[in-house]
């Protein structure tokens, strides 16, 4: 006998109809939020940035690769991470390559940023089998200027970060071991999506969203939300070549 509540088909349909109303309300709310997102003012990027890429140095405008929109995920992979990128960020990045062709044909270039040196990014990308362009922000202030990373001084001003450092939960200590960095160094990276537009040769910052927003979670998390069994509140993430089984 299943531990979960078992009912008749009629009971299931009644409960499903009730849930559908809530899901419909959420969908309407999501459309309202989407409209507000598109209405955000654009901010011109006046500072010049130079990035290390697999093809040499590039400016922010050159990262668009001829398209008018740039969407980037900031993978937590700081200069102090000795064991590679954050496993959770790695899970999300694993799911991006298949969407490249579809985004490119819709005038969007998709890339990932990290603060580790480009040589380490290239090696990690090869290990994971990723296909998207991987760009290093190691030699510039881009990550700090756009909130993709924070200095230790900035971290001291954030109560949530200080609470985690003062009394880290077990999963956070395990995560720190996985990335191979002291917790105070590891938490300096901010998993985020960031978007830019390019019009008439000018680049504009248009949007940023960071954890714990659900959009920063791997898509597999949304799939797991539709499965019968509830997932742990803080499930441990694994790189795909490190699962213990």
Task: Tell me the role of every PLM-derived stretch.
Residues 104-121:
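Catalytic nucleophile loop
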Residues 114, 136-138:
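Residues at the C-termini of beta-strands that transition into short coil/loop
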Residues 1-106, 123-129, 133, 140-245:
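Non-globular targeting/processing and membrane-anchoring segments
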């Amino acid at each position: 006998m299943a531990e979960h509540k078992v009912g008749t088909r009629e009971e299931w349909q009644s409960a499903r109809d009730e849930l559908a109303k809530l899901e419909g309300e959420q969908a309407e709310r999501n459309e309202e939020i989407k409209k507000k997102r598109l209405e955000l003012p654009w901010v011109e990027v006046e500072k010049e940035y130079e990035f290390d890429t697999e093809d040499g140095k590039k400016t922010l405008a050159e990262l668009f690769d001829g398209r008018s929109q740039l969407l980037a995920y900031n993978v937590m992979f700081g200069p102090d991470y000795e064991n590679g990128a954050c496993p959770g960020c790695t899970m999300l990045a694993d799911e991006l390559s298949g969407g490249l062709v579809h985004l490119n044909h819709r005038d969007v270039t998709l890339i990932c940023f990290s603060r580790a040196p480009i040589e380490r990014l290239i090696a990690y990308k090869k290990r994971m089998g990723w296909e998207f362009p991987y760009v290093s922000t190691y030699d510039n202030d881009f990550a700090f200027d756009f909130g993709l990373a924070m200095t230790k001084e900035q971290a001291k001003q954030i109560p949530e970060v200080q609470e985690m450092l003062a009394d880290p939960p077990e999963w956070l200590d395990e995560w720190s071991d996985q990335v191979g960095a002291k917790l105070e160094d590891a938490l300096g990276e901010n998993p985020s999506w960031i978007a830019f537009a390019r019009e008439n040769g000018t680049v504009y910052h248009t949007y940023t969203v960071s954890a714990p927003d659900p959009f920063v979670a791997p898509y597999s998390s949304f799939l797991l939300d539709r499965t019968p069994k509830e997932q742990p509140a803080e499930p441990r993430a694994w790189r795909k070549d490190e699962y213990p089984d």
